[in-house]
Amino acid sequence: MFEQHKLSLQNLSCQRGERVLFRALTCDFNSGDFVQIEGHNGIGKTSLLRILAGLVRPLEGEVRWDSEAISKQREQYHQNLLYLGHLSGVKPELTAWENLQFYQRISQAEQNTDMLWDLLEKVGLLGREDLPAAQLSAGQQKRIALGRLWLSQAPLWILDEPFTAIDKKGVEILTALFDEHAQRGGIVLLTSHQEVPSSHLQKLNLAAYKAE
């Protein structure tokens, strides 16, 4: 179980170019929350996740982790965060096995090869473990990146379209993992164009905060 945490969004507004996407977004995400960020294309879902991950600053407002602005505790905050964006982030020159082994080494997960074999099976890459990532499809590279979820000890997961290029069985496996993470006291925030098969899922629709 994780310690109790809270991610607070305080009066957030977001601008892209000359256009304000949303404004006055205030809400809290608490330990145990599994939330899908919704809204039409272009409303700022990815921009919001990047703000929450500390990659960009909001036009107005601030994000707080356990009551302190993330801008004042960047190192500590990022130790508590796993962010997976649109780009896979895998090292193309390394094999699938070597990429997962690298993730294992930089995480606080148990270091053993049995876990890696199990992980390769979970992400559907058994038989392709010795291929350089550069020779794999975009979907297979995405699966390597998703392997980090099973190795992560971070309580806060921020995931931009994690189901892209994933089949139905893979979506079910990932959703079960997200449910489990939330039940352990973690926080899962994601975007998805697909239906998320979870009875625990909450939804936040950015249309309610669309700038006039």
Swiss-Prot record:
- Look up the EC number in the record and give it: 7.6.2.5
Which species is listed as the source?
A: Haemophilus influenzae (strain ATCC 51907 / DSM 11121 / KW20 / Rd)
Where in the numbering of this chain does the ABC transporter domain appear?
Answer: 7-209
Presence of the UniProt keyword Cell inner membrane in the record: yes
Listed name of the protein: Cytochrome c biogenesis ATP-binding export protein CcmA
Source species taxonomy: Bacteria, Pseudomonadati, Pseudomonadota, Gammaproteobacteria, Pasteurellales
Which InterPro entries does this entry report, sorted A to Z? AAA+_ATPase, ABC_transporter-like_ATP-bd, ABC_transporter-like_CS, ABC_transptr_haem_export_CcmA, P-loop_NTPase
Catalytic reaction annotation: heme b(in) + ATP + H2O = heme b(out) + ADP + phosphate + H(+)
Residue stretches in coiled coil = none
Q: How does it assemble?
A: The complex is composed of two ATP-binding proteins (CcmA) and two transmembrane proteins (CcmB).
Q: Which GO terms describe its molecular function?
A: ABC-type heme transporter activity; ATP binding; ATP hydrolysis activity
